[in-house]
A protein has these predicted regions:
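Conserved signature/switch motifs of ABC ATPase nucleotide-binding domains
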Residues: 130-133, 151
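Conserved H-loop
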Residues: 185-191
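Conserved ABC ATPase "signature" region
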Residues: 108-127, 179
Length: 264
């Protein structure tokens, strides 16, 4: 489906004369994985929060599946960098809470089967009755991912979900996420600062620019470029740097980020 998510001329301004970004427009197709990259302050998280219904734009519109986004919805699952688990509930109970919200008519046995299926998808069945305080950082993020998938959202929104994890744990969960996305054909919008992570996971990469003074005039930030990822979709981390075109793609994105950093 073309244009499952549509962003039209989105802008956000905390000060009227200096919008953080302006005139941001893009589409995401159903089943597509799109990453957004840019320096801090360019508005990446603001855009994600607008898509999640947690913030409003100063102008412009965001549509998903033909309907304008006007507030939070269980049609969109969100995973933040911080795990956002309820500390007094177990893994099972944290996910069951979300499942009950989506399907209030379900009975406990049906909820448990559904929860266990999604906990198993992220390899945490042995820890299903533990509380967050008993889990490592990587395990908590796995729970967050399982919870997001468990409500079967039309779209998954990820705000640097692996940013606080060590490299080994991050790589393992990236692999798990890729497997689940392929299995479910999930539509994903993800913020990352990691160029290799974006190349590994995404079908397209959105490059954001920051607002800046140019010849004494303020120019808002915005969507500077949309980069198509030409690498085969069934790629793995180990294969990544062997693919023709990998270094050209990586260098292009790094050059963009370096040039924008110098502009500041």
């Amino acid at each position: 489906m073309t244009g499952f998510l549509k962003i039209e001329q989105l802008a956000k301004a905390y000060h009227q004369d200096k919008p953080v970004f302006a005139d941001v427009s893009f589409t995401i197709d159903k089943g597509e994985f799109v990453c957004i990259i840019g320096h801090s302050g360019c508005g990446k998280t603001t855009i994600l929060n607008v898509l999640a219904g947690l913030d409003t734009a100063s102008s412009g519109h965001a549509f998903m599946d033909g309907r304008e986004i006007s507030g939070p919805s269980l049609e969109r699952g969100v995973v933040f960098q911080s795990h956002a688990l309820m500390p007094w509930l177990t893994v099972r109970q944290n996910i069951a809470f979300a499942v009950k919200s989506k399907w209030p008519e379900w009975k406990t046995p049906q909820i448990n089967v559904h929860v266990e299926k999604h906990v198993d998808m992220v390899g945490l069945l042995p820890a299903i009755d533990k509380k967050p305080s008993q889990l490592s950082g990587g395990m908590k993020q796995r729970v967050g991912i399982a919870r997001a998938f468990a409500i079967q959202p039309k779209m998954l929104l990820l705000d640097e979900p692996f940013g606080a994890l060590d490299a080994l744990t991050r790589g393992t969960i990236q692999d798990e996420l890729m497997g689940i996305v392929r299995q479910t054909q999930q539509t994903v919008f993800m913020i990352t600062h990691d160029v290799d992570e974006a190349i590994l996971l995404s079908d397209r990469i959105l490059l954001m620019s920051n607002g800046n003074e140019v010849n004494g005039r303020y120019v808002p930030g915005g969507l500077a470029e949309v980069v198509q990822n030409p690498l085969p979709r069934d790629r793995t981390r180990a294969q990544l740097h062997h693919f023709p075109g990998y270094y050209d793609l990586r260098n292009h994105i790094v050059d963009f980020l370096v040039s924008r950093a110098k502009a500041h």
